[in-house]
Every structure is written in structure tokens, then in C-alpha cells.
Amino acid sequence: MRSWAEIDPEAALAYADSSLDAKSESRFGISEVLAGWANRDPEGAISWAKANNSSDKPEDNPLLLGVVKGLAENNIEAANKIFRELPPGSAKWQASTFLAQKYSDIGIRKAIEWADQLPKDDPRLRSTILGQLGAKLARQDIEATAKWVESLQDDKASFTVMNNLLTQWVTNCLL
């Protein structure tokens, strides 16, 4: 699907929508085409995703997840910008989980910088993402993660990170 997206992304999207299994294959195919398209022409992919959203909740556009994935491969800051503009909903949750993984792959310092910028207006999302990030980062660098936890405000998110840090610490001690 990615190769086809390089040549004719709209034809690839039409095929994925009409010829693949409606549940998983189609969603995956569309996401991959949009990711490939976003690498080459972010504005075109974004425009198509916005124009072709058929979600029950139009403001919660699952097609933008493919755009975020594609942008994150070469321009994570552009992907983060799209993520931040997403309204609360499934697309934002999925994009945040994906970006948490990408930022943690870049390195602990960049991941913590990204996490510290997450808005505090959605404590559930923040707690979940910081928890996922804390678990991954604790496996990479337990001391740096501990310093990060110390810098966090006492809230649900910091407790989730602390719990994941302690789980990793205990696991390391038992080995």
C-alpha cells in the first residue's frame, strides 16, 4: 500500500476502502496509504483525511492517525502538531500512544520534554500516556526516569509513572 501511495495515493485509498475487509484490513490499508502520502505530501494527505472522514463523530477523525504515523517517520514535530490539534477522542488516544512510542525510541530526554508538554486539561489521557512512557523509559534508564518522576507534580499521572518505575525497579532487583 505504501508503494502504491507513492504513485497514486487516491487510487490506493479507493482500493483499500472498497476491496479490503471492512474491519481490520481496510483500516490498516488506509492508514498505511495515508502514512506514505503524508511522507511525500503532508498537506494533501491531511486534506484528503479531513474531506473523507465518515466517522460517527466528525470531529474525531480516525484517518488523521495515518497522517500522524507517516509524519512521525521523518518529522515528529509536525506529527506532534497534528496530534495537539486533535480534539479529545479515539484518534487523539491512538495518536498519543503512537507518539509516546516514537518519542521514547528517540531517547529519554526528548521523550520527557514531549511528555512535559502534554496538556493537563485531560488528566486521564495524560496519566495513561505518562504511564506508558514511564514504563518504557524505566526499562531504558531507571535513574533518569526516577529523576523525571521527582520533577512531576503530585497527581494521578505522576503516581502512574512512579508505579511503573517501581515495578521496573523491583523486577531489576529480583533478577
Residue ranges with predicted function:
Residues 1-175:
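Non-catalytic tandem-repeat scaffold regions and their flanking low-complexity/translocation tails
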